[in-house]
């Protein structure tokens, strides 16, 4: 838990303390509840898992399916409106902003044939997904990729790719270093040195 909270302090310039993260950050609560719900889902206690997941959704405004696989240090910043689908896989140190959907693209017309099929995206380590982005289908967003705000991504994203637009297009290569809100250290020091 300590490493998880520290990883958020490292990525969010507004975060002031670990206690404030625990008490006031909905993303922290959603990840905590997901760990419990996922435990029950893995143990085949699906109803208990779904009840915990629904409680978390009502408390946080963040919907994470209990069977989604989430790595270490997922940071959901602001969080309201985030949806993470059942077959989503999220790597370590991923950052997701508000109103993001990791969803499927197939309508649920023939649910029986879709139950054991990968329908949702996989995000590898150190991916950042901007607010309002829709990452849809059984695609892979590779390590260190950045998805811009409101982008609609329906195809695989290369490592260090920068995806923007509708439909999303790769417009460059991302730095491997995480910079909150894209602010460099020089810009931060210039703006706040008074």
Give the label of every model feature segment:
Residues 106-107, 139, 174-175:
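Conserved catalytic-core motifs of eukaryotic protein kinase domains, centered on the activation segment
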Residues 1-60, 176-194:
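Terminal amphipathic alpha-helical/low-complexity segments used for targeting or macromolecular assembly
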Residues 48, 52, 95, 101, ...:
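Extended, non-globular alpha-helical segments
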Residues 54-64, 108-113:
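Short gly/ser/thr-rich secondary-structure transition/capping motifs
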Residues 20, 24, 58, 82, ...:
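Conserved short-loop catalytic and cofactor-binding motifs
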Residues 113-136, 166-194:
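C-terminal segments of enzyme domains that contribute to small-molecule binding surfaces
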Residues 60, 65-66, 71-72, 77-86, ...:
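Left-handed beta-helix
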